[in-house]
């Protein structure tokens, strides 16, 4: 029976490369022969071959003076980990090891996050995991990832990193531990640290903020002593030791264009200086989440013209994957009814037929993926941005809203985006895990209470706002409101004629009355035995006016887009074509 060496010499005599199978073990062997006799140093490029399994590759000189064996440590021969064992080679001396990146095949620099990779793939994986970036593939999710094409598809590159053993947990665990001073409780995080909540959001422990013990909760003043956050802080539940981590500093926010949240961030970076709000002396509540990351807050760029911002937004919008969900249909695409001109108002149209159709009941929100192991400010900001975009798209899908004209539409959304967003929070209460998000905010205020980084007045104001959100969402959940009812409540809020500066207020008021009549008819048909249901639902709307839009921005968006105001982003959102919305935003039915 021929040995491996004998088989190798047979192939060498033929002066060619060939794949053979050892009869004794059934192992695949690839023999590659160097044809150049004069060259001392040889470079061998291994080609992937079908049907191959982990085995040996013999690299030899034509005269068989030196035999090099390459052992595969990875089952995928397209990106092998190569160990070169040199025999009879005086130049190379003892055995040497040459590693190739398991992801792209470039020269590896060592083991990173559980896999042997190059510096490029190491940095790419680290940025993707730490920023919780979500990528999309424009192909069939099987793009070629090698040294020269690894930057063409970030989605396939990240999937390949994970498939070859790069661990997301390793990225989190390599961060430096937080040093806590002796004067402070060991269970309290500094106000400049990042706070994380457990990944298992359905667990009872998920609703308990990290670093808040029962004794610390008892020491809290004002609203906390009154038991307002009893649903956020379940009694008798103890938290396990949590992991504190710090984000990368001064890393550019070149996020994935496949998420609408990245559009908000990218557009915010191009915002004009006049759109930046003036910060007061108090630190924002998300300061403890942002951990001093200047990539979101420092927007001291050159002043951009409106044309520059519009062109940049158009380019970003074109990069989004078109959605295929019925909720992404163009406004009025499947609507019934007609429009006619109102006497004396040639520029405005009033729509005949129902104000809302069944298509407006659809309100599906998909959370960012992959889900981070620890809830952080970037994930909260991305989730809130998706909800904001989805709410704007819902308004755009109403033909009567479009009939008001662009200026009126923008004015209405600027005036009532906070109310629409809050209704969306209540509607997506479970999908977004709003209770856990609010718990994170409360945790930050606990930290500021310990560190004395915020004035008592400011802290009280923020606590009151969080409580209002909690109370409103809880009351809406208890009412078991269906999709039709949420749609009519949003329409009544959207078509509110009492905002100063609006034109065609009579038409807006007619649309609101129409929404109310249709709402009443729906409840009468659907809940004939619940006489006071309509009244109970309408009485929840005044609570929306108590929500401060500026504080909502600070809680949900400031950690993602810095000082850029939502008002400056809304006109660009409303100018987007519905077909340009990313299908990733729409998926799971509520």
UniProtKB/Swiss-Prot annotation:
DNA-binding region in chain numbering: 98-173
Region of interest (Required for interaction with KAT2B), residue spans: 1-166
Phosphothreonine: residues carrying this PTM: 208, 210
PTM annotation: Sumoylation requires both PIAS1 and UBE2I. Sumoylation appears to dissociate NR2C1 from the PML nuclear bodies. Enhances the interaction with NRIP1 but inhibits interaction with KAT2B. In proliferating cells, stimulation by all-trans retinoic acid, activation of MAPK1-mediated phosphorylation and recruitment to PML bodies with subsequent sumoylation, suppresses OCT4 expression.
InterPro entries membership: NHR-like_dom_sf, NR2C1/2-like_DBD, NR2C1/2-like_LBD, Nucl_hrmn_rcpt_lig-bd, Nuclear_hormone_rcpt_NR2, Nuclear_hrmn_rcpt, Znf_hrmn_rcpt, Znf_NHR/GATA
Domain NR LBD as annotated: residue spans: 333-577
Required for interaction with NRIP1: region residues: 571-590
Keyword field contains Nucleus: yes
Any one GO CC term of the record: nucleus
Zinc finger residue ranges, NR C4-type: 101-121, 137-156
Record PTM Phosphoserine, positions in chain: 185, 203, 568
Record keywords, A-Z: Activator, DNA-binding, Isopeptide bond, Metal-binding, Nucleus, Phosphoprotein, Receptor, Repressor, Transcription, Transcription regulation, Ubl conjugation, Zinc, Zinc-finger
Biological process terms in GO annotation: cell differentiation; negative regulation of DNA-templated transcription; negative regulation of transcription by RNA polymerase II; positive regulation of retinoic acid receptor signaling pathway; regulation of transcription by RNA polymerase II
SUPFAM superfamilies: Glucocorticoid receptor-like (DNA-binding domain), Nuclear receptor ligand-binding domain
GO molecular function, one term: DNA-binding transcription repressor activity, RNA polymerase II-specific
Chief location category: nucleus
Key word Metal-binding present: yes
Record-listed cross-link Glycyl lysine isopeptide (Lys-Gly) (interchain with G-Cter in SUMO2), residues: 238, 575
Function field: Orphan nuclear receptor. Binds the IR7 element in the promoter of its own gene in an autoregulatory negative feedback mechanism. Primarily repressor of a broad range of genes including ESR1 and RARB. Together with NR2C2, forms the core of the DRED (direct repeat erythroid-definitive) complex that represses embryonic and fetal globin transcription. Binds to hormone response elements (HREs) consisting of two 5'-AGGTCA-3' half site direct repeat consensus sequences. Also activator of OCT4 gene expression.
Family statement: Belongs to the nuclear hormone receptor family. NR2 subfamily.
Protein name: Nuclear receptor subfamily 2 group C member 1
UniProt organism field: Rattus norvegicus (Rat)
Gene: Nr2c1
């Amino acid at each position: 029976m021929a040995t491996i060496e004998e088989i190798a010499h047979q192939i060498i005599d033929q002066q060619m490369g060939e794949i053979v199978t050892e009869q004794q073990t059934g192992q695949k062997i690839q023999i590659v022969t160097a044809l150049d006799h004069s060259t001392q140093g040889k470079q061998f490029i291994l080609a992937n071959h079908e049907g191959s399994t982990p085995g040996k590759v013999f690299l030899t000189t034509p005269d068989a003076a030196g035999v090099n064996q390459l052992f595969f440590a990875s089952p995928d021969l397209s990106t092998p980990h190569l160990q070169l064992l040199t025999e009879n080679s005086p130049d190379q001396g003892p055995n040497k090891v040459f590693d190739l990146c398991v992801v792209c095949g470039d020269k590896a620099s060592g083991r990173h996050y559980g896999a042997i990779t190059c510096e490029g793939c190491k940095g790419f994986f680290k940025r993707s995991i730490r920023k919780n970036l979500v990528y999309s593939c424009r192909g069939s999710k099987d793009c070629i990832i090698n040294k020269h094409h690894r930057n063409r598809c970030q989605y396939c590159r990240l999937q390949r990193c994970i498939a070859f053993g790069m661990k997301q947990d390793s990225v989190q665990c390599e961060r430096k531990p937080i040093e806590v001073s002796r004067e402070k409780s060991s269970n309290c995080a500094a106000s400049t640290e990042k706070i994380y909540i457990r990944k298992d959001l359905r667990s009872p422990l998920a609703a308990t903020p990290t670093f808040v013990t029962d004794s610390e909760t008892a020491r809290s003043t004002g609203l906390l002593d009154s038991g307002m956050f009893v649903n956020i802080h379940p009694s008798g539940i103890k938290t396990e030791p949590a992991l504190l981590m710090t984000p990368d500093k001064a890393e550019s926010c070149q996020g994935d264009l496949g998420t609408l949240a990245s559009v908000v961030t990218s557009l915010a970076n191009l915002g004009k200086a006049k759109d930046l709000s003036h910060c007061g002396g108090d630190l924002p509540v998300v300061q403890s989440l942002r951990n001093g990351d200047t990539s979101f807050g420092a927007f001291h760029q050159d002043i951009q013209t409106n044309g520059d911002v519009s062109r940049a937004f158009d380019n970003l919008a074109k990069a989004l994957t078109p959605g295929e969900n019925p909720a992404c249909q163009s406004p009025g695409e499947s609507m019934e009814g007609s429009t006619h001109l109102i006497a004396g108002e040639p520029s405005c149209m009033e729509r005949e037929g129902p104000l809302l159709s069944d298509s407006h009941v659809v309100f599906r929100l998909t959370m960012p993926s992959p889900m981070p192991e620890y809830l952080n400010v970037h994930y909260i900001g991305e989730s809130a941005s998706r909800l904001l975009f989805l709410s704007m798209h819902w308004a755009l899908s109403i033909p009567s809203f479009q009939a008001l004209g662009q200026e009126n539409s923008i004015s209405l959304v600027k005036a009532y985006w906070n109310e629409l967003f809050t209704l969306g929070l209540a509607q997506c209460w479970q999908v977004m895990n709003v209770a856990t998000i609010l718990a994170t905010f409360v945790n930050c205020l606990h930290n500021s209470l310990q560190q004395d980084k915020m004035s008592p007045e400011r802290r009280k104001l923020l606590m009151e706002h969080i409580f209002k959100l909690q109370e409103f969402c809880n009351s809406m959940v208890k009412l078991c409101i269906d999709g039709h009812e949420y749609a009519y409540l949003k329409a009544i809020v959207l078509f509110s004629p009492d905002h100063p500066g609006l034109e065609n207020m009579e038409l807006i008021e007619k649309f609101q009355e129409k929404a109310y009549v249709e709402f009443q008819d729906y409840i009468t048909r659907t809940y004939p035995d619940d006489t006071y249901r309509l009244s109970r639902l309408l009485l929840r709307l005044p609570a929306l006016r108590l929500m401060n839009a500026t504080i909502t921005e600070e809680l949900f968006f400031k950690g993602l887009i810095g000082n850029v105001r939502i008002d400056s982003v809304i006109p660009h959102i409303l100018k987007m074509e519905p077909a340009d919305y990313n299908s990733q935003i729409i998926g799971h039915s509520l």
